[in-house]
Amino acid sequence: MRVVGLISGGKDSCFNMLQCVSAGHSIVALANLRPADHAASDELDSYMYQTVGHQAVDLIAEAMGLPLYRRTIEGSSVHIDREYSPTDGDEVEDLYQLLKHVKEEMHVDGVSVGAILSDYQRVRVENVCARLQLQPLAYLWRRDQAALLSEMISSGLHAILIKVAAFGLHPDKHLGKSLAEMELYLHELSEKYGVHICGEGGEYETFTLDCPLFKKKIIIDATETVIHSDDAFAPVGFLRFTKMHTEDKTEVRTL
């Protein structure tokens, strides 16, 4: 199938695209929903979308050599019942309009979706895909999270933490750390406090700097740390990318 990769920049959306290719599908375009330029924060109060790291999403398209379709999130979480039906002003309708445009231009048959555990997201993506006669491809759905994280790391996917929001995770200590660096500690947090190893409870979010599908790798040159909530036990903070570029993988970087 001709597939559009629905991406946030995080590990799940990128790894699911890798699974699509392994299954014989072709990723022909990427799609992303982003906050408005005038948004008060990179971190939108969205039930559906990761928006932290949106400044660098275009570099994923550059790294993969694919067209990127983007749309501003204009709606909000209006229809929050378990089942979803089309609702004016809901952020799900932004996804509908985005994928409708991609289907018209790129003649795609399927959508790569990095959902692992959220029924809320799954139901809404399936609703949009059904309305557009697109096939959702969610190879990570309900996978064991410990095994999945290990598989991501061993596949050559390199992602860093760009948001933390859980007891045991601290902006000063853990933002910018790679999944490989964090794997054992995430296991500890899971055993002690029930933290979801893949961050499916909102404990952390990531941004992918390299993976086997990338023809180039992404280099983050400069960031700033934003503290969203200075809670004494579980502070919420994220990285804002201020300077970044892509680089050929064959290049040897010198310090």
UniProtKB/Swiss-Prot annotation:
SUPFAM superfamilies named in the record: Adenine nucleotide alpha hydrolases-like
Enzyme Commission number(s): 6.3.1.14
Alphabetically ordered keywords of this record: ATP-binding, Ligase, Nucleotide-binding
GO terms under biological process: protein histidyl modification to diphthamide
CDD domains assigned: AANH_PF0828-like (cd01994)
Pfam families: Diphthami_syn_2
Transmembrane segments: none
GO molecular function: ATP binding; diphthine-ammonia ligase activity
Coiled-coil stretches noted in the UniProt entry, renumbered to this chain: none
Listed InterPro entries: Diphthami_syn_dom (IPR002761), DPH6/MJ0570 (IPR030662), Rossmann-like_a/b/a_fold (IPR014729)
PANTHER family hit by this protein: DIPHTHINE--AMMONIA LIGASE, DOMAIN OF UNKNOWN FUNCTION 71 DUF71 -CONTAINING PROTEIN
Family per record: Belongs to the Diphthine--ammonia ligase family.
Function, as annotated: Amidase that catalyzes the last step of diphthamide biosynthesis using ammonium and ATP. Diphthamide biosynthesis consists in the conversion of an L-histidine residue in the translation elongation factor eEF-2 (EEF2) to diphthamide.
NCBIfam families per the UniProt record, alphabetical: MJ0570_dom
Protein name: Diphthine--ammonia ligase
Organism: Danio rerio
Gene name of the record: dph6
